Amino acid sequence: MEYTKLAQLYQILEETTSRIKMTQALVDLFKETPPELIDKVVYLSIGRIAPEYTGLDYNFSEKSAIKALSTVLNISEHDIQHQVLQTGDLGDAGKKLYEEKGVKPEGILTVEEVYRTLREIAQTTGYGSTKKKLQLFTELLKKASPLEVKYLLRTITERLRLGIGDNTIMDALSIAFTGKKENREIIERAYNISSDLGYVARILAEKGLDAVKNIKIEIGRPIRPMLAERMAIPSYILKKLGGKAGAEYKYDGERIQVHRKGDTFYLFSRRLENITDQFPDLIEFLKESIPEECIIELEAVVIDPSSGAIRPFQDLMNRRVKYVTRFHIMMYPIAGFIFDIMYLNGEDLTLKPYPERRKILEENIKITERINLSERKIVDNVEDLESFFHQAIEDGCEGLVCKSLQKDSIYQAGKRGFLWIKYKRDYKSHLADTLDLVVVGAFYGKGARTGYFGSLLMACYDPETDQFKTVCKVGTGFKEDDFKKLDDLLKEHTLDHKHPRVNSILSADIWYEPFLVLEITGAELTLSPVHTCGWDRIKINRGLGLRFPRFTGRYRFDKRPEDATTEEEIINMYKNQIQIKS
C-alpha cells in the first residue's frame, strides 16, 4: 500500500471540520487497507507507531528534521528555518521547498516502509543514535513526494494534528468492517480493556467482530481507567446511587494501575504511561501485599513516616523524574491505598459488581505499614455521609468517591458514569468542584505580561462529538514562573488556525493543539453568550461559562485531553448549583 494514500487522507482530514466527513474519509481508507496493515495505518494516523503505554516515541527534534531536509534539498538549515518562520509549520515549509526545488522522489514510499523505518528510529537509542536516526529519516525523505514530506515531517516531530480522536477512529472501524456504527460499543469495550486501538483494528479486519468480542485482559496491557461523575449535594448522591453507597476516601495522590505476574511488575499512570521505574520502593511494598497474578488500582501518596500523615500532592510530583534516586525515596516516601481489583489469577473481574470486587480485595490483600485498602464506609443517610466526608478532609483527603452497591456496579473501563460519584465540595464558592480543562488558545498579555499570554482559553471535552468546547478565559492564579513554564510547554503545540476539534466562538490570538490539562477553580457557572460548553442545552443561543476562573497551580500531566472534565459534567454541575442556591 502506497504511503501517498495516507498523505492524501491526512490532507482531507486537515481541510475539514466535519466529523461526518472525517469519519467517511477514514471508512474509505480502511476499506482499501489490507488487513495485515490496518494496525499500522491506525497507529500512523494518530501520529504514533505503537500504543502509548509502550513508551515508544521518536525522540526526534525539529532541529534534526531540518538537518535531514537540508541534506536532501542541498540548501542551508538557515534557509529552511526562514521558510518555517514564513509558513509557521515545518511540514508546510518542507512541502513548499520540495515543490520549488522540483525534487523527484527516488522511489515509491509504502506504508510498510514508512512504518518500519519510523519504528526503527523510535527503537534506536544509545551511543551514535542521533546520527543513525538522522540517516534513516533522510532516506525516507529522498523517496517522498512534496505532500508525503509534509506529513512525514509532522509525524516525526509529533505534530500530525489531524483533528481525529479515538472515538472517530472507532466509529470508522465499526462502519468499515461491520457495516454499521452500532457495533462501535463492542470495539470500544475491546479497546478499553487492551488500550491498543491498532491491535483491536487488526483483529477486527482479519478475524471479524466475534474475535473482537473475545479479546481478553492481559498482564502488561493497561486497562483504560473507570471515571467518576461529580455531585455536590449528599442527598442527591444517595438518591442517584439507590439510597445506599460505599463511600471511599478520595486521596490527593496519583492514580496507578498495577499489573503483577510473579516478580514482574508494570505500573501505569492514569494516562497509561509506563511509570514502573519511578516507584521501585512501591513495587517492593507491593510484593508483600498483593497476589502473584493480578491487576489492581491504587492511589499513591507521599507520607510523613513519623506520623503517617499524607503530604501535599506537590510533594508527590517530585517523584515524577526520569531517574529516581535514593534521595527521592528517602525525601518523598510512598504509601499506596488500593481501591479496586480488575483481574485475579486469570479471571476478568471487571464485570463483577463493586461489592464483590471489594470483598475479593479484602480477602487477597495483605495490609502492611505502607500498603492499605482505601478507607471505606457503607452509608445510607445524609448525616453519615456528611460525617465521613468531614473525616476524610481532616485526614488530608480531597473528599469522597461514593460507589454504587447495585448489581450493575461493574468496573466500566474507559467510561465515566454515575456508578462512581465524586464528592469534593468547595465551601468558598457555589462551584462544587475544580474543573480539569484543556488549553486551546491564548490572548496576548499587556504590561508586566508583555511577551507572554494575558489569559488562556480553556475548554471541556464532549465525547459525543469528540470536540473541545470553551468554558472560560483564565488569567489569574499564575505565579511568575508559570508564565515561562507554560510558554515552554505550549510553544511546540502552537497552530496558525483553530484546531479542528475545538468548538469556539471566541477568536484567540494564538491557537494550540489540545494537549495540556490544567486544574481551574472559580466562583460559579453561568449562562454565557460566548462559550460553547452546553450550547443550547440550558437556553437557546447560550452556553455555560465559569465566572472568576483561577488556576489552582496544578498541572494535570496525569490526564490526557480526553480525560478533561466533560460537557455533561459541567451541565450537571450547573443544575446542581441552581438547586443549591434555591
Swiss-Prot record:
Entry keywords, A to Z: ATP-binding, Cell cycle, Cell division, DNA damage, DNA recombination, DNA repair, DNA replication, Ligase, Magnesium, Metal-binding, Nucleotide-binding
Gene (name only): lig
Cofactor(s) annotated in UniProt: Mg(2+)
Active site: K250
Chain residues that bind ATP: E248, R255, R270, E299, F339, R416, K422
CDD domains according to UniProt: Adenylation_DNA_ligase_Arch_LigB, OBF_DNA_ligase_I
ATP-binding as UniProt keyword: yes
InterPro entries, per database record: ATP-dep_DNA_ligase, DNA_ligae_ATP-dep_bac/arc, DNA_ligase_ATP-dep, DNA_ligase_ATP-dep_C, DNA_ligase_ATP-dep_cent, DNA_ligase_ATP-dep_CS, DNA_ligase_ATP-dep_N, DNA_ligase_N_sf
Single GO term (MF): DNA binding
Protein name: Probable DNA ligase
Catalysed reactions, as listed in the record: ATP + (deoxyribonucleotide)n-3'-hydroxyl + 5'-phospho-(deoxyribonucleotide)m = (deoxyribonucleotide)n+m + AMP + diphosphate
Domain of life according to the entry: Bacteria
Lineage start: Bacteria, Pseudomonadati, Aquificota, Aquificia, Aquificales
Similarity comment: Belongs to the ATP-dependent DNA ligase family.
